Amino acid sequence: MSSAQRKDDHVRLATEQQRAHSGRNQFDDVSFVHHALAGIDRPDVRLATTFAGITWRLPLYINAMTGGSAKTGAINRDLAVAARETGAAIASGSMHAFFRDPSCADTFRVLRTENPDGFVMANVNATASVDNARRAVDLIEANALQIHLNTAQETPMPEGDRSFGSWPAQIAKITAAVDVPVIVKEVGNGLSRQTLLALPDLGVRVADVSGRGGTDFARIENSRRPLGDYAFLHGWGQSTPACLLDAQDVGFPLLASGGIRNPLDVARALALGAGAVGSSGVFLRTLIDGGVSALVAQISTWLDQLAALQTMLGARTPADLTRCDVLIHGPLRSFCTDRGIDIGRFARRSSSADIRSEMTGSTR
């Protein structure tokens, strides 16, 4: 099967997953404590976020999806238009197809041509050569480079890689060689605390935990196998909220993606420490079903609703959500117990003094 056919398969199967999804994931195990006098005035709310010296107008980004075929190039064009119209940052899908076949360059370059002033991230795997990583950045004039980690995808992939031991050293080489920030990310199986703590030694200063709960690439690749004999890998890894809880105080900025279904999930991820939050599968489904205008409307609605949540919770900025009290329930609570995570600290982050301050600082 050609690389272009595989990319088209990924889009089809990811969209089918979104349509069949049960709707529940571990973000439902995170709830805000409601303080009825904590609210502020909507004009006081801002959505801009800053992490690792990078400032985005919005704490929401369109995460890595696709590229490498005529069909996926058209999808990338529409995604770029949506990013341009809303101000959201955007990431390319894996650019490995471009390294194999430079004739598909325009399916990735369109992310920049349609969005000349936006924040665009290139995307390579951990086996990419330094030269190819630079080519990826140059092709789309990228502002940052994502390096994706995907052992649980490669393992069931019929044509997948089976050699992972060189990845840390190669990440270090790429990070040292490119002139843009590097963001190491998973593809939906999560980054553990141990993995995150290893990244600074490789020169990495930002990570996207990209946990379980959204598109399941192990399931996608297994469905491409004649016997479907890797079904036991479906649902592998840690959820996005589990990763964020596991990563408390790692000492460098984190982004969050994987299983983001609505603005409340965005707020939950920000409250657990993410500097910004990405979505892929939900946005892809909206684009496929309704076109670029529907996606622009969805992103705009999410941003308006996120600002409404911040207003109700008393968070003037996305970062202020980390001062809001949250409760951890169900299986996520069990994960925290097993990993030795003190969840009580999240339930007692605000104080009555905070609420009194908001009352005296706003007109009721």
UniProtKB/Swiss-Prot annotation:
Biased composition (Basic and acidic residues): 1-13
Record key words, sorted: Cytoplasm, Flavoprotein, FMN, Isomerase, Isoprene biosynthesis, Magnesium, Metal-binding, NADP
Residues that, per the record, bind substrate: R6, K7, S94, M95, H96, Q153
Swiss-Prot/TrEMBL GO biological process terms: isoprenoid biosynthetic process
Region annotation (Disordered) ranges: 1-24
Cofactor: FMN; NADPH; Mg(2+)
Signal peptide start-end: none
GO molecular function, one term: isopentenyl-diphosphate delta-isomerase activity
Enzyme Commission number(s) from the entry: 5.3.3.2
EC primary class: isomerase
Function: Involved in the biosynthesis of isoprenoids. Catalyzes the 1,3-allylic rearrangement of the homoallylic substrate isopentenyl (IPP) to its allylic isomer, dimethylallyl diphosphate (DMAPP).
Family according to the record: Belongs to the IPP isomerase type 2 family.
Name of this protein: Isopentenyl-diphosphate delta-isomerase
Protein's organism: Kitasatospora griseola
